From Swiss-Prot:
Any Gene Ontology CC annotation: cytosol
Known partners and oligomeric status: Homodimer.
Protein name per Swiss-Prot or TrEMBL: Tyrosine--tRNA ligase
Cited PANTHER family: TYROSINE--TRNA LIGASE, MITOCHONDRIAL, TYROSYL-TRNA SYNTHETASE
Species assigned in the record: Shigella boydii serotype 4 (strain Sb227)
Binding annotation for L-tyrosine: 37, 175, 179
Location of N6-acetyllysine modifications: 144
Amino acid sequence: MASSNLIKQLQERGLVAQVTDEEALAERLAQGPIALYCGFDPTADSLHLGHLVPLLCLKRFQQAGHKPVALVGGATGLIGDPSFKAAERKLNTEETVQEWVDKIRKQVAPFLDFDCGENSAIAANNYDWFGNMNVLTFLRDIGKHFSVNQMINKEAVKQRLNREDEGMSITEFSYNLQQGYDWTCLNTHYYVELQIGGSDQRWNITSEIDLTRRLHQNHVLGLTVPLITKADGTKFGKTEGGAVWLDPKKTSPYKFYQFWINTADADVYRFLKFFTFMSIEEINALEEEDKNSGKAPRAQYVLAEQVTRLVHGEEGLQAAKRITECLFSGSLSALSEADFEQLAQDGVPMVEMEKGADLMQALVDSELQPSRGQARKTIASNAITINGEKQSDPEYFFKEEDRLFGRFTLLRRGKKNYCLICWK
Protein backbone atom coordinates (compact mmCIF):
# COMPACT_ATOMS: atom_id res chain seq x y z
CA MET A 1 0.00 0.00 0.00
CA ALA A 2 1.83 3.10 -1.24
CA SER A 3 2.25 5.92 1.27
CA SER A 4 1.47 8.67 -1.26
CA ASN A 5 -2.18 7.66 -1.64
CA LEU A 6 -2.63 5.71 1.59
CA ILE A 7 -5.56 7.77 2.91
CA LYS A 8 -7.39 7.46 -0.40
CA GLN A 9 -6.92 3.69 -0.32
CA LEU A 10 -8.17 3.50 3.27
CA GLN A 11 -11.21 5.55 2.27
CA GLU A 12 -11.90 3.20 -0.64
CA ARG A 13 -11.97 0.34 1.86
CA GLY A 14 -14.40 2.25 4.11
CA LEU A 15 -11.80 2.45 6.87
CA VAL A 16 -11.91 6.20 7.52
CA ALA A 17 -14.69 7.68 9.66
CA GLN A 18 -13.14 11.12 10.31
CA VAL A 19 -9.80 12.88 9.90
CA THR A 20 -9.17 15.96 12.04
CA ASP A 21 -7.45 17.71 9.10
CA GLU A 22 -7.46 15.58 5.96
CA GLU A 23 -5.52 18.06 3.83
CA ALA A 24 -2.79 18.45 6.44
CA LEU A 25 -2.52 14.67 6.86
CA ALA A 26 -2.21 14.12 3.11
CA GLU A 27 0.51 16.77 2.93
CA ARG A 28 2.39 15.29 5.87
CA LEU A 29 2.27 11.74 4.48
CA ALA A 30 3.54 13.04 1.13
CA GLN A 31 6.63 14.39 2.90
CA GLY A 32 7.75 10.99 4.17
CA PRO A 33 7.26 8.40 6.93
CA ILE A 34 5.28 9.34 10.02
CA ALA A 35 5.07 7.83 13.51
CA LEU A 36 1.54 6.98 14.59
CA TYR A 37 -0.08 5.22 17.51
CA CYS A 38 -3.18 3.40 18.62
CA GLY A 39 -4.07 2.69 22.24
CA PHE A 40 -5.45 -0.54 23.66
CA ASP A 41 -6.75 -0.45 27.22
CA PRO A 42 -6.53 -3.72 29.19
CA THR A 43 -10.19 -3.93 30.22
CA ALA A 44 -10.08 -7.73 29.83
CA ASP A 45 -7.43 -10.41 29.44
CA SER A 46 -7.77 -10.40 25.65
CA LEU A 47 -8.50 -8.12 22.73
CA HIS A 48 -11.69 -8.83 20.79
CA LEU A 49 -12.87 -8.33 17.21
CA GLY A 50 -13.68 -4.68 17.90
CA HIS A 51 -9.94 -4.03 18.27
CA LEU A 52 -9.03 -5.70 15.00
CA VAL A 53 -9.78 -2.83 12.58
CA PRO A 54 -7.53 -0.23 14.30
CA LEU A 55 -4.86 -2.88 14.89
CA LEU A 56 -4.86 -3.82 11.21
CA CYS A 57 -4.75 -0.11 10.34
CA LEU A 58 -1.47 0.13 12.24
CA LYS A 59 -0.25 -2.78 10.12
CA ARG A 60 -1.42 -1.07 6.90
CA PHE A 61 0.51 2.08 7.81
CA GLN A 62 3.62 0.06 8.62
CA GLN A 63 3.41 -1.74 5.27
CA ALA A 64 3.38 1.72 3.66
CA GLY A 65 6.64 2.60 5.43
CA HIS A 66 5.38 4.35 8.57
CA LYS A 67 6.32 3.65 12.20
CA PRO A 68 3.53 2.22 14.39
CA VAL A 69 3.42 2.52 18.17
CA ALA A 70 1.09 0.12 19.98
CA LEU A 71 0.25 1.69 23.34
CA VAL A 72 -1.16 -0.61 26.00
CA GLY A 73 -2.83 1.41 28.75
CA GLY A 74 -1.43 0.02 31.97
CA ALA A 75 -2.45 3.28 33.67
CA THR A 76 -5.63 4.21 31.78
CA GLY A 77 -6.76 0.60 32.20
CA LEU A 78 -6.81 1.20 35.96
CA ILE A 79 -9.33 4.03 35.42
CA GLY A 80 -11.53 2.98 32.49
CA ASP A 81 -12.80 5.00 29.55
CA PRO A 82 -16.29 6.38 30.34
CA SER A 83 -17.04 7.26 26.70
CA PHE A 84 -20.64 6.28 25.87
CA LYS A 85 -20.76 3.81 28.78
CA ALA A 86 -24.09 3.58 30.57
CA ALA A 87 -22.47 2.88 33.95
CA GLU A 88 -19.09 3.18 35.62
CA ARG A 89 -16.62 0.41 34.92
CA LYS A 90 -15.55 -1.90 37.71
CA LEU A 91 -12.07 -0.98 38.96
CA ASN A 92 -9.61 -3.85 38.66
CA THR A 93 -6.54 -4.39 40.84
CA GLU A 94 -3.08 -3.33 39.66
CA GLU A 95 -2.00 -6.98 39.60
CA THR A 96 -4.92 -7.94 37.37
CA VAL A 97 -4.39 -5.04 34.99
CA GLN A 98 -0.66 -5.76 34.73
CA GLU A 99 -1.41 -9.39 33.90
CA TRP A 100 -3.80 -8.23 31.18
CA VAL A 101 -1.21 -5.74 29.86
CA ASP A 102 1.28 -8.57 29.38
CA LYS A 103 -1.27 -10.72 27.56
CA ILE A 104 -2.40 -7.92 25.25
CA ARG A 105 1.16 -6.95 24.36
CA LYS A 106 1.76 -10.55 23.31
CA GLN A 107 -1.44 -10.52 21.24
CA VAL A 108 -0.48 -7.32 19.43
CA ALA A 109 3.08 -8.44 18.65
CA PRO A 110 2.37 -10.85 15.74
CA PHE A 111 0.51 -8.18 13.76
CA LEU A 112 3.44 -5.76 13.60
CA ASP A 113 7.11 -6.01 12.64
CA PHE A 114 9.40 -5.01 15.50
CA ASP A 115 12.61 -5.62 13.57
CA CYS A 116 12.46 -4.00 10.14
CA GLY A 117 14.75 -1.00 10.38
CA GLU A 118 13.65 2.60 10.76
CA ASN A 119 9.93 1.84 10.76
CA SER A 120 10.14 -0.99 13.30
CA ALA A 121 7.10 -1.05 15.57
CA ILE A 122 7.30 0.04 19.21
CA ALA A 123 5.30 -1.34 22.14
CA ALA A 124 4.66 1.22 24.89
CA ASN A 125 2.84 1.26 28.24
CA ASN A 126 1.45 4.50 29.67
CA TYR A 127 2.06 3.23 33.21
CA ASP A 128 5.70 4.13 32.50
CA TRP A 129 4.90 7.85 32.75
CA PHE A 130 1.89 7.78 35.05
CA GLY A 131 3.08 5.19 37.58
CA ASN A 132 5.27 7.58 39.59
CA MET A 133 3.44 10.84 38.85
CA ASN A 134 2.00 12.54 41.95
CA VAL A 135 -1.39 14.24 42.05
CA LEU A 136 0.05 17.77 42.25
CA THR A 137 2.05 17.26 39.06
CA PHE A 138 -1.01 15.77 37.36
CA LEU A 139 -3.24 18.70 38.31
CA ARG A 140 -0.70 21.47 37.68
CA ASP A 141 0.95 20.20 34.49
CA ILE A 142 -2.00 18.48 32.83
CA GLY A 143 -5.25 19.49 34.51
CA LYS A 144 -4.76 23.24 34.04
CA HIS A 145 -4.89 22.81 30.24
CA PHE A 146 -8.38 21.26 30.25
CA SER A 147 -11.65 23.20 30.41
CA VAL A 148 -14.38 21.58 32.49
CA ASN A 149 -16.97 23.50 30.47
CA GLN A 150 -15.74 21.93 27.25
CA MET A 151 -15.43 18.47 28.76
CA ILE A 152 -18.97 18.31 30.11
CA ASN A 153 -20.32 19.41 26.74
CA LYS A 154 -18.74 16.43 24.99
CA GLU A 155 -21.50 14.06 23.84
CA ALA A 156 -19.78 11.04 25.42
CA VAL A 157 -19.92 12.75 28.83
CA LYS A 158 -23.32 14.42 28.46
CA GLN A 159 -25.03 11.09 27.96
CA ARG A 160 -23.89 9.97 31.42
CA LEU A 161 -24.46 13.29 33.18
CA ASN A 162 -28.02 13.47 31.86
CA ARG A 163 -28.93 10.11 33.38
CA GLU A 164 -30.77 10.46 36.67
CA ASP A 165 -29.64 7.05 37.90
CA GLU A 166 -25.96 7.27 36.95
CA GLY A 167 -23.47 10.13 37.15
CA MET A 168 -19.73 10.19 36.57
CA SER A 169 -17.00 10.01 39.19
CA ILE A 170 -13.91 12.23 39.24
CA THR A 171 -11.93 9.04 38.56
CA GLU A 172 -13.65 8.48 35.22
CA PHE A 173 -13.75 12.19 34.45
CA SER A 174 -9.95 12.27 34.65
CA TYR A 175 -9.59 9.61 31.94
CA ASN A 176 -9.61 12.22 29.19
CA LEU A 177 -6.74 14.06 30.89
CA GLN A 178 -4.72 10.87 31.12
CA GLN A 179 -5.25 9.97 27.51
CA GLY A 180 -4.40 13.51 26.47
CA TYR A 181 -1.05 13.27 28.20
CA ASP A 182 -0.30 9.95 26.47
CA TRP A 183 0.09 11.65 23.13
CA THR A 184 2.25 14.40 24.62
CA CYS A 185 4.66 11.76 25.94
CA LEU A 186 4.63 9.75 22.72
CA ASN A 187 5.20 12.93 20.73
CA THR A 188 8.19 13.77 22.92
CA HIS A 189 9.80 10.33 22.96
CA TYR A 190 8.89 8.90 19.54
CA TYR A 191 7.80 11.99 17.53
CA VAL A 192 4.31 10.53 17.12
CA GLU A 193 2.21 12.83 14.93
CA LEU A 194 -0.91 10.74 14.23
CA GLN A 195 -3.35 8.80 16.38
CA ILE A 196 -5.70 6.10 15.12
CA GLY A 197 -8.78 5.14 17.11
CA GLY A 198 -12.39 4.06 16.85
CA SER A 199 -14.96 6.73 16.00
CA ASP A 200 -16.15 6.61 19.63
CA GLN A 201 -12.70 8.00 20.57
CA ARG A 202 -13.05 11.22 18.59
CA TRP A 203 -13.56 13.48 21.61
CA ASN A 204 -10.58 11.93 23.41
CA ILE A 205 -8.42 12.38 20.31
CA THR A 206 -9.34 16.05 19.87
CA SER A 207 -8.49 16.69 23.54
CA GLU A 208 -5.10 15.05 23.03
CA ILE A 209 -4.45 17.18 19.95
CA ASP A 210 -5.22 20.35 21.92
CA LEU A 211 -2.96 19.38 24.84
CA THR A 212 -0.02 18.42 22.62
CA ARG A 213 -0.29 21.70 20.73
CA ARG A 214 -0.39 23.70 23.96
CA LEU A 215 2.56 21.94 25.56
CA HIS A 216 4.78 21.45 22.52
CA GLN A 217 3.32 23.72 19.83
CA ASN A 218 3.38 20.65 17.57
CA HIS A 219 0.77 20.04 14.88
CA VAL A 220 -0.61 16.53 15.41
CA LEU A 221 -3.49 14.77 13.70
CA GLY A 222 -6.17 12.18 14.34
CA LEU A 223 -7.86 9.55 12.18
CA THR A 224 -10.81 7.49 13.36
CA VAL A 225 -12.00 4.21 11.91
CA PRO A 226 -15.70 3.33 11.84
CA LEU A 227 -17.35 1.20 14.47
CA ILE A 228 -18.39 -1.86 12.50
CA THR A 229 -22.05 -2.78 12.31
CA LYS A 230 -23.78 -5.47 10.28
CA ALA A 231 -26.11 -4.72 7.39
CA ASP A 232 -29.12 -5.56 9.55
CA GLY A 233 -28.06 -2.91 12.07
CA THR A 234 -26.98 -5.32 14.80
CA LYS A 235 -23.65 -5.06 16.58
CA PHE A 236 -20.66 -6.71 14.93
CA GLY A 237 -18.33 -9.07 16.79
CA LYS A 238 -20.87 -10.70 19.10
CA THR A 239 -22.32 -14.19 19.16
CA GLU A 240 -24.95 -15.75 21.39
CA GLY A 241 -22.08 -16.69 23.69
CA GLY A 242 -20.75 -13.12 23.90
CA ALA A 243 -17.73 -11.39 22.39
CA VAL A 244 -15.45 -13.03 19.83
CA TRP A 245 -11.98 -12.87 21.37
CA LEU A 246 -8.55 -12.98 19.73
CA ASP A 247 -7.19 -15.26 22.47
CA PRO A 248 -7.60 -18.90 21.32
CA LYS A 249 -8.26 -19.93 24.93
CA LYS A 250 -11.34 -17.68 25.02
CA THR A 251 -12.58 -18.20 21.45
CA SER A 252 -11.13 -21.27 19.78
CA PRO A 253 -9.75 -21.01 16.22
CA TYR A 254 -12.60 -23.30 15.10
CA LYS A 255 -15.26 -21.05 16.63
CA PHE A 256 -13.45 -17.98 15.26
CA TYR A 257 -13.39 -19.52 11.76
CA GLN A 258 -17.08 -20.42 11.98
CA PHE A 259 -17.94 -16.85 12.99
CA TRP A 260 -16.61 -15.61 9.64
CA ILE A 261 -18.11 -18.51 7.66
CA ASN A 262 -21.52 -17.40 8.94
CA THR A 263 -21.11 -13.83 7.65
CA ALA A 264 -24.20 -12.62 5.77
CA ASP A 265 -23.94 -12.09 2.01
CA ALA A 266 -24.84 -8.43 2.59
CA ASP A 267 -21.74 -7.97 4.78
CA VAL A 268 -19.06 -10.27 3.40
CA TYR A 269 -17.50 -8.09 0.67
CA ARG A 270 -17.42 -5.07 2.98
CA PHE A 271 -15.74 -7.17 5.68
CA LEU A 272 -13.15 -8.38 3.16
CA LYS A 273 -12.19 -4.71 2.72
CA PHE A 274 -12.05 -4.12 6.48
CA PHE A 275 -10.31 -7.25 7.72
CA THR A 276 -8.08 -8.56 4.91
CA PHE A 277 -5.21 -7.28 2.81
CA MET A 278 -6.77 -8.35 -0.48
CA SER A 279 -6.80 -5.54 -3.02
CA ILE A 280 -10.06 -3.80 -3.94
CA GLU A 281 -9.69 -5.29 -7.42
CA GLU A 282 -9.42 -8.83 -6.00
CA ILE A 283 -12.47 -8.31 -3.78
CA ASN A 284 -14.54 -6.87 -6.63
CA ALA A 285 -13.52 -9.78 -8.87
CA LEU A 286 -14.55 -12.28 -6.18
CA GLU A 287 -17.92 -10.55 -5.79
CA GLU A 288 -18.50 -10.69 -9.54
CA GLU A 289 -17.50 -14.36 -9.62
CA ASP A 290 -19.94 -15.18 -6.81
CA LYS A 291 -22.78 -13.34 -8.55
CA ASN A 292 -22.28 -15.21 -11.80
CA SER A 293 -21.38 -18.69 -10.53
CA GLY A 294 -24.89 -19.86 -9.71
CA LYS A 295 -23.40 -21.57 -6.65
CA ALA A 296 -23.02 -20.71 -2.98
CA PRO A 297 -20.72 -17.67 -2.55
CA ARG A 298 -17.03 -18.40 -2.05
CA ALA A 299 -16.44 -15.08 -0.27
CA GLN A 300 -17.27 -16.33 3.23
CA TYR A 301 -14.63 -19.08 2.97
CA VAL A 302 -12.04 -16.61 1.66
CA LEU A 303 -12.85 -14.21 4.51
CA ALA A 304 -12.73 -16.94 7.17
CA GLU A 305 -9.44 -18.28 5.84
CA GLN A 306 -7.76 -14.87 5.56
CA VAL A 307 -8.75 -13.55 8.99
CA THR A 308 -8.21 -16.83 10.86
CA ARG A 309 -4.71 -17.06 9.39
CA LEU A 310 -4.01 -13.44 10.41
CA VAL A 311 -5.10 -13.99 14.01
CA HIS A 312 -4.27 -17.65 14.69
CA GLY A 313 -1.59 -18.44 12.13
CA GLU A 314 -1.45 -21.28 9.62
CA GLU A 315 -1.64 -23.96 12.32
CA GLY A 316 -4.79 -22.48 13.83
CA LEU A 317 -6.39 -22.12 10.41
CA GLN A 318 -5.66 -25.71 9.40
CA ALA A 319 -7.08 -27.01 12.70
CA ALA A 320 -10.26 -24.98 12.17
CA LYS A 321 -10.66 -26.26 8.60
CA ARG A 322 -9.93 -29.84 9.67
CA ILE A 323 -12.58 -29.75 12.40
CA THR A 324 -15.09 -28.16 10.01
CA GLU A 325 -14.51 -30.82 7.36
CA CYS A 326 -14.71 -33.70 9.85
CA LEU A 327 -17.98 -32.47 11.33
CA PHE A 328 -19.42 -32.05 7.84
CA SER A 329 -18.32 -35.48 6.63
CA GLY A 330 -18.91 -37.33 9.89
CA SER A 331 -15.46 -38.94 9.75
CA LEU A 332 -13.41 -38.10 12.83
CA SER A 333 -10.21 -40.00 12.01
CA ALA A 334 -8.25 -36.84 11.12
CA LEU A 335 -9.00 -35.06 14.41
CA SER A 336 -6.26 -34.73 17.01
CA GLU A 337 -6.74 -34.57 20.77
CA ALA A 338 -6.15 -30.80 20.56
CA ASP A 339 -8.95 -30.56 17.98
CA PHE A 340 -11.34 -32.28 20.38
CA GLU A 341 -10.25 -29.84 23.09
CA GLN A 342 -11.31 -26.98 20.80
CA LEU A 343 -14.70 -28.63 20.34
CA ALA A 344 -15.03 -29.05 24.10
CA GLN A 345 -14.12 -25.40 24.66
CA ASP A 346 -16.78 -23.80 22.48
CA GLY A 347 -17.21 -25.76 19.25
CA VAL A 348 -20.30 -27.84 20.00
CA PRO A 349 -22.51 -28.35 23.07
CA MET A 350 -20.67 -30.38 25.71
CA VAL A 351 -21.76 -32.57 28.59
CA GLU A 352 -19.67 -34.33 31.24
CA MET A 353 -20.65 -37.89 32.09
CA GLU A 354 -19.51 -40.72 34.34
CA LYS A 355 -18.28 -43.92 32.73
CA GLY A 356 -20.88 -46.67 32.55
CA ALA A 357 -23.62 -44.47 31.08
CA ASP A 358 -25.93 -45.75 28.36
CA LEU A 359 -26.75 -44.05 25.06
CA MET A 360 -30.32 -43.09 25.99
CA GLN A 361 -29.14 -41.28 29.13
CA ALA A 362 -26.43 -39.50 27.14
CA LEU A 363 -28.99 -38.20 24.65
CA VAL A 364 -31.15 -36.85 27.48
CA ASP A 365 -28.26 -35.34 29.47
CA SER A 366 -26.91 -33.70 26.31
CA GLU A 367 -30.38 -32.32 25.50
CA LEU A 368 -30.30 -33.98 22.10
CA GLN A 369 -33.53 -35.64 23.26
CA PRO A 370 -36.13 -34.52 25.83
CA SER A 371 -36.75 -37.94 27.42
CA ARG A 372 -35.57 -41.55 27.48
CA GLY A 373 -38.74 -42.55 25.64
CA GLN A 374 -38.06 -40.14 22.80
CA ALA A 375 -34.39 -41.14 22.83
CA ARG A 376 -35.38 -44.80 22.38
CA LYS A 377 -37.49 -43.96 19.31
CA THR A 378 -34.78 -41.78 17.78
CA ILE A 379 -32.08 -44.43 18.25
CA ALA A 380 -34.32 -47.11 16.75
CA SER A 381 -34.95 -44.87 13.72
CA ASN A 382 -31.22 -44.98 12.93
CA ALA A 383 -30.80 -41.21 13.46
CA ILE A 384 -27.94 -41.35 15.99
CA THR A 385 -24.23 -41.68 15.34
CA ILE A 386 -21.42 -42.26 17.83
CA ASN A 387 -18.10 -40.90 16.57
CA GLY A 388 -19.50 -40.99 13.04
CA GLU A 389 -20.82 -44.57 13.27
CA LYS A 390 -24.56 -45.32 13.21
CA GLN A 391 -26.00 -46.87 16.37
CA SER A 392 -29.56 -48.25 16.34
CA ASP A 393 -29.60 -50.26 19.59
CA PRO A 394 -31.60 -48.36 22.27
CA GLU A 395 -29.99 -50.52 24.99
CA TYR A 396 -26.45 -49.59 23.94
CA PHE A 397 -23.87 -48.90 26.67
CA PHE A 398 -20.71 -46.99 25.78
CA LYS A 399 -17.54 -49.04 25.41
CA GLU A 400 -13.92 -48.15 25.99
CA GLU A 401 -13.30 -47.79 22.25
CA ASP A 402 -16.01 -45.11 22.10
CA ARG A 403 -13.84 -42.86 24.27
CA LEU A 404 -11.45 -41.23 21.79
CA PHE A 405 -8.13 -40.37 23.43
CA GLY A 406 -9.74 -41.88 26.51
CA ARG A 407 -11.76 -38.68 26.99
CA PHE A 408 -14.18 -37.80 24.19
CA THR A 409 -17.25 -39.19 22.43
CA LEU A 410 -19.05 -37.22 19.73
CA LEU A 411 -22.79 -37.78 19.38
CA ARG A 412 -24.83 -36.60 16.42
CA ARG A 413 -28.59 -36.58 15.93
CA GLY A 414 -29.60 -36.22 12.31
CA LYS A 415 -27.17 -34.22 10.19
CA LYS A 416 -26.40 -31.11 12.23
CA ASN A 417 -27.12 -31.64 15.94
CA TYR A 418 -23.93 -32.46 17.84
CA CYS A 419 -22.91 -32.95 21.43
CA LEU A 420 -19.50 -33.86 22.78
CA ILE A 421 -19.32 -36.13 25.81
CA CYS A 422 -16.32 -35.46 28.03
CA TRP A 423 -15.83 -38.49 30.25
CA LYS A 424 -14.99 -37.92 33.90
